[in-house]
Amino acid sequence: MSKKVQKVVLAYSGGLDTSIILKWLQTTYGAEVVTFTADLGQGEELEPARRKAQLLGIKDENIFIEDLREEFVRDYVFPMFRANAVYEGQYLLGTSIARPLIAKKQIEIAEKVGADAVAHGATGKGNDQVRFELGYYALKPDITIIAPWREWDLRSREQLIAFAEQHQIPIAKDKRGEAPFSVDANLLHASSEGKVLEDPAQEVPDYVYSRTIDPEAAPDQPTYITIDFEQGDAVAIDGGKMSPATLLAKLNELGRANGIGRLDLVENRFVGMKSRGMYETPGGAILLVAHRGIEQITLDRGAAHLKDELMPKYAELVYNGFWFSPEREMLQAAIDQSQRYVTGQVRLKLYKGNVILVGRDSAYSLYDQDLVTFEEGAVAYDHRDAAGFIKLNALRLRTLGQRRKKLGL
C-alpha cells in the first residue's frame, strides 16, 4: 500500500470469496467500496448480489449491476469467432474473452464515481489476474490495482470461513467445506477447474457437467439446423433473425440437447504452469464449424491460408490478456477485412456430440461446379493446362535433383 486508497471498484459476484474480499478491502484499506456485477449470461440471478452488497454496508449508489450479454457477444465473442480463434488447437477461449469487458466496465465505473483503485478476485496462480490487470493498465495507466489473493494472509478455506464468520458474512451451508471444483460461466461457456479435476489421469465425474448432456444419452435421431451469416457474423437460425446474445443462447440449447461442446483439456497457462480444465462450449462449438463452413466457399485460398497462419497468434493474444494491444487490433482489422463476403447459409447435422457440416451456400461463393466437375461443361477445365503448371513448380526440385545426381548424393 504505497498510497492511501480512497475508493475502490470491486469486480463482485456476490459469492463467498468476493464478499470476503469486499469486507477485507473495507477493514484493510479503510476505503469506500463500489461493487460491479456483470451479467454475461452465467445463468445466475444477480439481485442476490445486490442484497449481499447492501448487507455488507455498500450504499445503493455504489452498487452497479449491468446486463452485458449483447455487448459481450457482439463486441467480443463474434469478433473472436471471425478469426476462428482456438488456443492450443482446442480451447475456444470462453473465460479469456470475458475478462476484457469486465475490466473495461470497471474502469468506466471508476472514472464515473471518482475511484482511484480497482480490485478483482483472481488468484495469484492463474491467468485471470494477468487478463484483468493488463486491461486495467491499458485503459487507465495510473489506476491502483488491488489483488487481495496476492496480499492477504488468508491461506486456507478454514481461514476464509473464520474471517467470514468474524465479520458476519453469510455462508451457504455447502460452502463450509471445500468445494469439489470451481466454476466460471458466461454465455459462451462454462469451465470447471481444481480439486477433483487436478489429476489428469482421472476421468471427469458426471456431476461436473452443467451445460451439456452426455453424448451417449443424446437423442438417437439427428437435429438439422441452418445458420445464416452476414460478413462473418451469425445472424439467423433456421431463417429466424436473432440478436447476437439470443442466437448464441439458442445454439447453447441445441448443443446441450445433443451433447455437443465438451472438452477435457490440459493447457499451458501464461503464468508458466500446466492446468487441467473441463470446458463446455455447446453453442461455440456449433458456431465454429458453421463459420469455417461458410468461409470454405467465400474466402480466396490465399486469404484463407493467411488467416490460418494468423489465428494461433490471435488466440494466444486473447488467452494471455492482450485484447487491448495494438497487435490484436491490427490482426482484427485484417480479419474483419477478410469477412466482407463471408455471407451465406450453412446446414448442420447435430448428433451425439458431433457437429457435422452437410451443406453451404452463398451468393458470393467462389466454388464453380463447372470447373470441378468430371463432366465436360461450358467452361470445363482443360486438363492439358496442368502440365505447364506442374513443370514450372517442379523447376527448383529438378534443379536440386540434378545437383544431387552430379555429386552422387
Curated annotation (Swiss-Prot):
GO biological process, one term: urea cycle
A GO term from the CC aspect: cytoplasm
SUPFAM superfamilies hit by this protein: Adenine nucleotide alpha hydrolases-like (SSF52402), Argininosuccinate synthetase, C-terminal domain (SSF69864)
Binding site for ATP: 11-19, 38, 121
Localization annotation: Cytoplasm
Keyword Chaperone: no
This enzyme's EC code(s): 6.3.4.5
Gene Ontology MF terms: argininosuccinate synthase activity; ATP binding
Pathway this chain belongs to: Amino-acid biosynthesis; L-arginine biosynthesis; L-arginine from L-ornithine and carbamoyl phosphate: step 2/3
Residues annotated for L-aspartate binding in this entry: 123, 127-128
Binding sites annotated in the UniProt record for L-citrulline: 91, 96, 127, 131, 182, 191, 267, 279
Position of the signal peptide: none
Main location: cytoplasm
Keywords: Amino-acid biosynthesis, Arginine biosynthesis, ATP-binding, Cytoplasm, Ligase, Nucleotide-binding
Sequence similarity: Belongs to the argininosuccinate synthase family. Type 1 subfamily.
HAMAP family listed in its UniProt record: Arg_succ_synth_type1
Subunit-structure text: Homotetramer.
Protein name as annotated: Argininosuccinate synthase
Organism, as annotated: Nitrobacter winogradskyi (strain ATCC 25391 / DSM 10237 / CIP 104748 / NCIMB 11846 / Nb-255)
Gene designation: argG
